[in-house]
Amino acid sequence: MASPWPVWTLSWILILLAVLVPGAAADFNISSLSGLLSPVMTESLLVALPPCHLTGGNATLTVRRANDSKVVRSSFVVPPCRGRRELVSVVDSGSGFTVTRLSAYQVTNLAPGTKYYISYLVTKGASTESSREIPMSTFPRRKAESIGLAMARTGGMVVITVLLSVAMFLLVLGLIIALALGARK
């Protein structure tokens, strides 16, 4: 007869994994960064929308300030997907310009320089799915005087300005001469 140890050991390992893995009950992940866009501003944050399979569901975005019990909830209907859902997606690119679409929810009226925890709860029909709670922080406010103006007036800008000024002078001078010669005939 086989020893019951492997069965007991496996069951205990599974129980420990279920208990110790944080956030194991979350159904989907949300992201805050895309590499193309900084979603953080001084008084607002951009959060990716819930996944496409939740289109049409009622989403509740929960924003909780770190070290505070105050919770702000915002509700909206998950918009339909048009292709892959990314925070920023290229819609059209050609002839020197690129059109992008921003697929994000903007959380507004936040305090500058503060850490927040953000999560979704989406109800679609009889099913309810939730996201993991992700931390995001707003930028602190900076005085306008403290923002560095490196390269405010570069040498290239000065040269271009001088060349354009000389060209405009010559153009106006040529126009005056052409009008004067045309009026004499």
From Swiss-Prot:
Residue ranges crossing the lipid bilayer per the database entry: 157-177
Task performed by this protein: Component of the asymmetric unit membrane (AUM); a highly specialized biomembrane elaborated by terminally differentiated urothelial cells. May play an important role in regulating the assembly of the AUM.
UniProt keyword list: Cell membrane, Cleavage on pair of basic residues, Glycoprotein, Membrane, Signal, Transmembrane, Transmembrane helix
GO molecular function, one term: structural molecule activity
Keyword Transmembrane helix set for record: yes
A family per Pfam: Uroplakin_II
Glycosylation sites: N29, N58, N67
InterPro entries, A to Z: Uroplakin-2
Membrane side Lumenal: residue ranges: 86-156
Topology versus the membrane: Single-pass type I membrane protein
Topology, Cytoplasmic side: 178-185
Protein name, UniProt field: Uroplakin-2
Top-level taxon in the UniProt lineage: Eukaryota
Description of how the protein assembles with itself and partners: Interacts with uroplakin-1a (UPK1A).
Signal peptide boundaries: 1-26
Tissue note: Bladder epithelium.
CDD domains: UP_II
UniProt source species: Bos taurus (Bovine)
Family membership: Belongs to the uroplakin-2 family.
GO cellular component labels: apical plasma membrane; apical plasma membrane urothelial plaque; endoplasmic reticulum; membrane; plasma membrane; protein-containing complex
